[in-house]
């Protein structure tokens, strides 16, 4: 029988995490499942709250903030289920979503991973999938994101068409991503050089390198509230993003990496090594 481990990595997001856990508990998946929380040394009382309020949830407490990639890797290694569903702590899981994701991936042996449609608190869909990250695709994705945020009619129409159709993008967001555990291990898990950002794009690239593909499944919807811990530490978040961006280009686009460094240095945004 298919089973799934639901993994949530958290850092100082106690309120969002408890809302996420409550959303799962309100309509538990019928698929045999286990929920695992990886706490990255939070100082907001998260470990105690999980132990006290969610005794059925397994808590993995790190002694330091190891980041999203390394936190997920630890949980994936320790899981014993066929599937692993990675969730951000700032998501709300709707009834039937976990079962639908397990069914979608389980029914398609050519797919290595799948992601649902992500929507914000206002119900607007997010751009939670895309082409392989590179200089031109990044420019296109960022321009599209800005136009969509401004509710530019052409951008809104294009995004709304894309989020309604199942397709095979190069990546889906790590905010909610389901993968077969065996495939995750075969791909080498997440590259833990990425503390925050780009790890999902890199992971999907590793999964695709075996000849498999990634699924976007719009029939399943998950709410993504977008991280409080990141909003509280915008400078740290920006540095983490830039470090991951540089690491990604050094790995996947080494000819472009020096140009990226020059660009970031001119902007005063080049992170320390």
Where do the protein language model's features map onto the residues?
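Glycine-rich, basic loop-to-helix element that forms the pyrophosphate-binding segment
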Residues: 61-79, 100
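Active-site-adjacent helix/loop segment of glycosyltransferases
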Residues: 198, 202-273
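A short, conserved alpha-helix in the catalytic core of glycosyltransferases
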Residues: 162-164, 170-189, 193-221
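Short aromatic/hydrophobic "clamp" motif used to bind/position activated sugar donors
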Residues: 84
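Conserved donor NDP-sugar-binding/catalytic core segment of glycosyltransferases
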Residues: 92-128
């Amino acid at each position: 029988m298919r089973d799934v481990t639901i993994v949530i990595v958290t850092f100082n997001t106690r309120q969002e995490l408890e809302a996420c856990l409550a959303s799962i508990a309100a309509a538990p998946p019928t698929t045999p499942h286990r929920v695992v929380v990886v706490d990255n040394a939070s100082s907001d009382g998260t470990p105690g709250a999980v132990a006290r309020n969610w005794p059925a949830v397994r808590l993995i407490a790190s002694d330091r903030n190891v980041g999203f990639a390394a936190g997920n890797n630890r949980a994936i290694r320790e899981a014993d289920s066929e599937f692993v569903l990675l969730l951000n702590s700032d998501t709300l899981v709707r009834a039937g979503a976990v079962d639908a994701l397990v069914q979608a991936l389980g029914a398609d042996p050519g797919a290595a991973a799948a992601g649902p449609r992500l929507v914000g608190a206002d119900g607007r869909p997010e751009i939670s999938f895309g082409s392989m990250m590179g200089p031109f695709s990044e420019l296109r994705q960022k321009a599209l994101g800005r136009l969509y945020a401004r509710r530019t009619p052409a951008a809104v129409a294009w995004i709304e068409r894309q989020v309604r159709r199942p397709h095979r993008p190069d990546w889906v967001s790590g905010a909610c991503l389901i993968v077969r555990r065996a495939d995750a291990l075969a791909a080498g898990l997440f590259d833990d050089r990425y503390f925050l950002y780009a790890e999902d794009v890199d992971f999907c690239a590793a999964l695709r390198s075996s000849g498999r593909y990634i699924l976007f499944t719009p029939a399943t919807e998950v709410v993504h509230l977008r991280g409080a811990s990141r909003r509280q530490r915008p400078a740290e978040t920006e540095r983490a993003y830039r470090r991951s961006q540089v690491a990604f280009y050094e790995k996947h686009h080494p000819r472009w990496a020096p140009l990226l460094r020059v660009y970031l240095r001119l902007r005063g945004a080049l992170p320390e090594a």
